[in-house]
Amino acid sequence: MVAEVCSMPTASTVKKPFDLRSKMGKWCHHRFPCCRGSGKSNMGTSGDHDDSFMKMLRSKMGKCCRHCFPCCRGSGTSNVGTSGDHENSFMKMLRSKMGKWCCHCFPCCRGSGKSNVGAWGDYDHSAFMEPRYHIRREDLDKLHRAAWWGKVPRKDLIVMLRDTDMNKRDKEKRTALHLASANGNSEVVQLLLDRRCQLNVLDNKKRTALIKAIQCQEDECVLMLLEHGADRNIPDEYGNTALHYAIYNEDKLMAKALLLYGADIESKNKCGLTPLLLGVHEQKQQVVKFLIKKKANLNVLDRYGRTALILAVCCGSASIVNLLLEQNVDVSSQDLSGQTAREYAVSSHHHVICELLSDYKEKQMLKISSENSNPEQDLKLTSEEESQRLKVSENSQPEKMSQEPEINKDCDREVEEEIKKHGSNPVGLPENLTNGASAGNGDDGLIPQRRSRKPENQQFPDTENEEYHSDEQNDTRKQLSEEQNTGISQDEILTNKQKQIEVAEQKMNSELSLSHKKEEDLLRENSVLQEEIAMLRLELDETKHQNQLRENKILEEIESVKEKTDKLLRAMQLNEEALTKTNI
């Protein structure tokens, strides 16, 4: 048996996974979810552990790679790289077959010791499979049958609702509202809602009637349930809300209606996916655009720590990557395994996405460099420096003005003292000369001398007065020039302040205009939504009318066929009677 496994595979065995799926799938598809299409553990369900092939595989792989086979040795610790058994012929064969076939279970076979579990096809899609109920007639009572098929007259339905409990559940915990909503019987739904049935009852998968209506894309029933107050945010057993199913179905209209009625745009399912992350993972570009417009969080993380950008890269959707990069998302964020979006793009050989990411990084670097060398900031700094200088000059000018009057006062005192000295004895002549002249010659002889001496005696005080007046004029000129300078500086300060006020007013006006625009946009969106809902109702009414006309035509044809058959039967009977009479 060992020799068979270690030998090189033939052409027929290459097409299949060399009987490992048939053996390992039963034995342990806890580690081989792709072998049987299920990630559930099947340990202990059969006696295949004693198979000779599995004993050999356990003996080889258990030592060689416990990272991939933790159940073989009872340990989940990685043993990759501890021995050289990877170059064994058995491992070469296993790498050649399983490396490409199942890197979910064999991440180390691709030359990496890191776990790749949860990187690609890790999400459970069973929630979105089989949206409609599988109904067996014998499992339903009269009310549930009428709710599912909807071919019962209104009077009979009213009688049924009087006689039985309208919130009664079947074996699968479904109410009449569940069945009517899932099959699109809007008349039955309306009748149940008018009778005030319970809206948020959960079936065996914890789904409400609203979730079933959205899952089965029954728009009219969805609108009826929302108008009557059905809860939009109740999750099912997978954690999905009604909005998750609307996004999965790419039903933008129902997603709009749910958000209009207050659905949570950031609700996560058990995989950690918000509606946006689900749309990215399923590569629903139009719905992703819609959620971005509705301001969904672009940096939210799933259970593996991955952003919307990393998911888009992993799925290989270049268009969604471009969409997200236009919104300036974080490119450098890492998931729980420490990998960025660029590393995933490089490892999966998505060259277009690599180019998009590199171009985005270059643009961001250019933006940062332009912001660092911004001329507006330099202008702001120079204006601030000028204002500080003007303030300093204003503070220094009053000090100068206060010092100048003190100097002028000192000068005035000195001049007054000198005038007093010269006024008491103007020339300093001896008293005897003046007296003698007055005795001999009288007053006439002395008067000419005094007249001639007065200009000489008073020459000094006149020159001093002139100097004083010139100093005063210079001081006044200085004061005037300084006052003019201060006036100019004050004017400049006022103009700067006015400019600042104008800029602030412009900012306020722009912010107000933006808020008004946002309000107008919201009002327009609401009006558009209401118009779309009205159009939907009109379309549904038209389709109903057309269906009724078709049904009437079919009924008329059936009646005509019945009449013809009745006539034929009567003719047959008459012929038989005639034959019997002739025979008699």
Curated annotation (Swiss-Prot):
Annotated localization: Cell membrane
Which tissue types show expression of this protein? Expressed in prostate, ovary, testis, placenta and prostate cancer cell lines. Localizes to basal and terminal prostate epithelial cells.
Q: What's the chief localization of this chain?
A: membrane
Gene Ontology CC entries for this record: plasma membrane
- Bias category Polar residues: which stretches? 482-498
Keyword Lyase applies = no
This protein is called POTE ankyrin domain family member D
Family membership noted in the UniProt record: Belongs to the POTE family.
Q: Which domain of life is it from?
A: Eukaryota
User: Which organism was this protein described from?
Assistant: Homo sapiens
